[in-house]
Amino acid sequence: MTEFAPLLVADGVVAGYLPGVDILKGVDLTLGRGELVGIIGPNGAGKSTLVKAIFGLVRVGGGVVTLEGEDISNLAAHELVARGVGYVPQRDNVFPTLTAEENLRMGLYLEPEAWDERIASVLELFPHLAGRSSQRAGLMSGGERQMLAMSRALMMNPRVILLDEPSAGLSPANQDLVFDTVRQICDSGVSIIMVEQNARRCLQICDRGYVLDQG
């Protein structure tokens, strides 16, 4: 059962890519433990900017982001990973010249000794990767690359995963597979914030949803 005690909170977040040009203008968001939260809205509304701001890729110029009450605003990516926050971008989310196994090992750069334990749990969710360990990521289909990217994030043993449009550019069948897998990941105990253009499918699998419009 989902526990709605706050795990991650964005409180009045103001952020943008250029000084004085704010894309987000005071956004509030709460993620509970074991919860899957969707963020939908039109193109250019600031959805991707929000998850990038949470992950420290876009500077937070106002408001605060907290994880279990700790201010994590503007922390570096490696500091957030160490605190259990993972991020899967929409594009360039795998290393195309590396094999699937090498991509997964990149998710363990902080804890390389945990390979045996983590790979076993990841392959329970992504069994098809077991036979693809030596395949270069760049030769995989779009759906397979997305699964590999999510798998690598799970190798970090995160408490929170930020997903930026995981279904973008995929066939309807692969979109369904991605959405089903996202729900399974959440049901395994990982809290998820998912930005998504496919509002209907997003809201079907999410516990709650936010609509973002013009920041």
Q: Model-derived features: where do they sit?
A:
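A short, flexible loop at the N-terminus of ABC-type nucleotide-binding domains that lies
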Residues: 2-10, 14-26, 33, 57-59, ...
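ABC ATPase C-loop
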Residues: 153-154
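Conserved catalytic motifs of ABC-family nucleotide-binding domains
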Residues: 157
